[in-house]
Amino acid sequence: ADWPDVRTLRLEMLTDTPLAYLETLEHAHCRREWEWRAWARDGSSADSITVAAITASGRWVGTMMSKVPHGAPAAFLYGVYVAPDHRGEAAGVTDALLSRIEDWARDRGDTLSLEVNEANPRAVAAYRKRGFVETGVTRPYPLDRTLRELEMRKPLR
């Protein structure tokens, strides 16, 4: 991946929906070029995948990442973002990205899990619509411990 595109999309993500990520915009702005280059280079491996939606003009408009944490029985979805002007069923970006992640995750386990901030009802609704259900497990959001992260899971088989 081209690191300037990765950086631009990450900064857009953190500006648009700061509660959705475990990094602040201020922290991202402090990253050095070599860090962005490493992030772009290391996007996928045997136990992780990064997918991106890129328009015909080359603009990055969405991304999702998944990994199988060490010792975990299934994949975890994170780093989800679709640009506001590409959201919604008509655009199909979310479904296309998620379909690719699910295909990858299906080879690694029976479920796909995620954590979503309770203060992001749009995301919670989008995940529910796509078959994710809350497990009842919650955790404090690391950047604001007054908020909770809801664990959601989707069966893949």
Label for each model-derived stretch:
Residues 76-77, 92, 111, 122:
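Amphipathic alpha-helical recognition patches that constitute DNA-binding helices
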Residues 31, 72, 88, 92, ...:
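Residues at secondary-structure transition points
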Residues 7-8, 12-85, 98-104, 140, ...:
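Acetyl-CoA-dependent GNAT
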Residues 1, 71, 117-121:
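Short, surface-exposed acidic/glycine-rich loop or hinge patches that mediate macromolecular interfaces
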Residues 3, 43, 72, 108, ...:
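A generic structural micro-feature
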Residues 82, 89-103, 125-129:
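Conserved acetyl-CoA-binding loop-helix of GNAT-fold acetyltransferases
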Residues 2, 102-103, 107, 119:
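Short N-terminal alpha-helical targeting/association segments
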Residues 108-124, 128-157:
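C-terminal "cap" of GNAT-fold acetyltransferases
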